[in-house]
Amino acid sequence: MGNEVRVRYAPSPTGHLHIGNARTALFNYLFARSQGGKFIIRIEDTDRKRNIEGGEQSQLNYLKWLGIDWDESVDVGGEYGPYRQSERNDIYKTYYEELLEKGLAYKCYCTEEELEKEREEQAARGEMPRYSGKCRNLTKEEQEKLEAEGRQPSIRFKVPQGEVIRFDDIVKGEISFETDGIGDFVIVKKDGTPTYNFAVAVDDYLMKMTHVLRGEDHISNTPKQIMIYNALGWDIPAFGHMTLIVNESRKKLSKRDESIIQFIEQYEELGYLPEALFNFITLLGWSPVGEEELFTKEQFIEIFDVNRLSKSPAVFDTHKLKWVNNQYVKKLDLDQVIELTVPHLQKAGKVSEELSGSEQEWVRKLISLYQEQLSYGAEIVELTELFFKDDIQYNREARTVLEEEQVPEVLRVFAEKLEQLDSFTADEIKASIKAVQKETGHKGKKLFMPIRVATTGQTHGPELPQSIELLGKDTVLKRLHNIIQ
């Protein structure tokens, strides 16, 4: 193999881009770019029953959205194509026929029912299920007889017995498997389709992959692929198996786990930023030197070291993701935040589909008020709820504030000051609050908290005078009088 690093991300077009797969793509991409190598995308579509229409394009679109680009694939071509496994059947045929000729693979005529019975008998004896090798040494006559009965053969790889397969995993160190624990495995199904392990081994060799970085759920596939490499006399790439992503309860991420949003498409729909997701996902199972946590793509490429992939499972912390995204939202200019949030307010029916001059200016001020605390685009609907409803529900903490003895006086004087205002602006409202302080002698929390709670229903929030301006004079006075009465 040459010195140039060549790595791949090989999705199946079975659905949308999952965060675990996005992470695999990101680590391979960063490794290739950090080494001045090539990043390839290969589509593994041999399991036709699971493929969905548009699945392939969806994967590519969301990789692009994340900021990942590639050197070779179905869309950009390359010298080692085709890059879709379903278009490589003639290539696979060459190599499984070679294995058959060398006696390193054989035709298996067992039916699914026979194999199931075999597995049940092994389980009853407390043995690990593996193929017995029943068809391993059939004579040509026996094979012809079975074919005359109408049996379609699959092709099995002849696993060498009594050997140990060892490889030095980039992430986990040395891993070994005894071949006696691995039964002869199918490399070509009865319908002539190559199985995953065979197609992957052939493709990785012919596409000149130097490293195979993937999830640790593939570890048990690795000895099978190494045996295929050995049987065909090929150099073996370096393997690295990344730890799984777990939820905050340290349980393996399951697609049924609804506590975590798991598809990149959903994050785009919620108004997360691709740069923030790129940053967050890269730190799931990889750590830089030092304490810094926010990096641009270019910085990641510069500092990425494949030897710093973690040996421990990566915990998906939703609060951390929101924090990371918020850091990126804060850096946007206001027009970008408006672009990120307004569609969510429109979808929720809070503002017009076509914003007019005065409404546009009001929305602009509203979003400016919440930019600092906004975690993701769609959150704007929840954060600004108090501006779009007539009545406020006060929670226990808010009611406790309103029960303090100075509250009636503070709110009465504040309402009087607001009623006298000709210009209902944040500056005038700020001056009114100061006037209340002067007249009542109350200051600090004793002054601000009752005003905030009475007008917004919340004990925390953005700048108070600006919030009151955006609520409007009528709404604010109505809320104040409701409490005073």
UniProtKB/Swiss-Prot annotation:
Gene3D superfamilies: 1.10.10.350, HUPs. A motif ('HIGH' region) lies at residues 11-21. Keywords: Aminoacyl-tRNA synthetase, ATP-binding, Cytoplasm, Ligase, Nucleotide-binding, Protein biosynthesis. SUPFAM superfamilies: An anticodon-binding domain of class I aminoacyl-tRNA synthetases, Nucleotidylyl transferase. It is an enzyme of class 6 (ligase). A motif ('KMSKS' region) lies at residues 252-256. GO terms for biological process: glutamyl-tRNA aminoacylation. It is found in: Cytoplasm. PROSITE patterns: AA_TRNA_LIGASE_I. Its main location: cytoplasm. The keyword Cytoplasm applies. ATP binds at K255. GO terms for cellular component: cytosol. The keyword Glycosyltransferase does not apply. One of its GO terms (molecular function) is ATP binding. PANTHER family: GLUTAMATE--TRNA LIGASE, GLUTAMATE--TRNA LIGASE, MITOCHONDRIAL-RELATED. Belongs to the class-I aminoacyl-tRNA synthetase family. Glutamate--tRNA ligase type 1 subfamily. Monomer. Catalyzes the attachment of glutamate to tRNA(Glu) in a two-step reaction: glutamate is first activated by ATP to form Glu-AMP and then transferred to the acceptor end of tRNA(Glu). This is Glutamate--tRNA ligase. It comes from Bacillus licheniformis (strain ATCC 14580 / DSM 13 / JCM 2505 / CCUG 7422 / NBRC 12200 / NCIMB 9375 / NCTC 10341 / NRRL NRS-1264 / Gibson 46). The gene is gltX.
